Regions:
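Multi-pass alpha-helical transmembrane bundles in non-GPCR membrane proteins
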Residues: 2-194
Length: 194
């Protein structure tokens, strides 16, 4: 019996349906464009946040942009791989793990700069703790329950209900509308994932 850990490559994991070459190229290219956009936006966002709101905002926004960069990059690589490649499953695990990172990353600037205090730090701990758990689950579980993963994604996404009062008092209708639109589109998208 070996003591070394291995990636979850169990036959219980399945790749999504095989897409056409054109669909895979389109997915890979659009996600690569998103990754490059995040690289361009990283210094701009960090400098703007630091100049306007201070170092805490710059750190939070940098975490947000880096998390989106990682999500887009992993997805671009995943879709660029041949469907029959032995590495495709590992890339699928990484690609789906980046969803956790993107969700936690999107909460980080809000929790640090808008909410702050014990509630903000509690949200950060919950988000990043769930991210670590979710990634370890994807890597090491003997059988992946996609509905459980979906539950974790949705739970993380809708933790916003606990910080709505802080957000409402510190932002305006445009921010509320964007958050609501993002949450609803994310939830509708999750239905397709399931």
């Amino acid at each position: 019996m070996s003591n070394t850990a291995t990636f979850n490559t169990s036959p219980n994991l399945k790749l999504s349906k095989k897409l056409s070459f054109g669909e895979e190229v389109a997915n890979s290219v659009t996600h690569a464009v998103g990754a490059v956009a995040m690289l361009v936006l990283l210094p701009i966002t960090a400098v703007h946040a630091n100049n306007g709101y201070g170092m805490t905002a710059a750190v939070g926004m940098s975490v947000f942009v880096i998390s989106l960069f990682l999500m887009f990059l992993s997805s671009a690589i995943y879709h660029a791989m041949d469907y029959n490649s032995p590495h495709k499953m590992v890339l699928r695990i990484i690609d789906h793990s980046m969803i956790y990172i993107a969700i936690a990353g999107s909460y980080t600037p809000v929790a640090l700069s808008l909410v702050g205090g014990w509630l903000g730090y509690s949200i950060i701990i919950l988000q990043w703790g769930t991210t670590i758990f979710g990634i370890l689950y994807k890597i090491f579980a003997k059988k992946i329950n996609e509905k459980f993963s979906l539950f974790l994604y949705l739970m993380m996404g809708w933790l916003v209900i606990f910080i709505i009062p802080a957000i409402v008092t510190k932002t305006g209708p445009a921010f509320w509308g964007l958050m609501l639109a993002g949450g609803l589109s994310y939830t509708v998208g999750a239905a397709f994932y399931a």
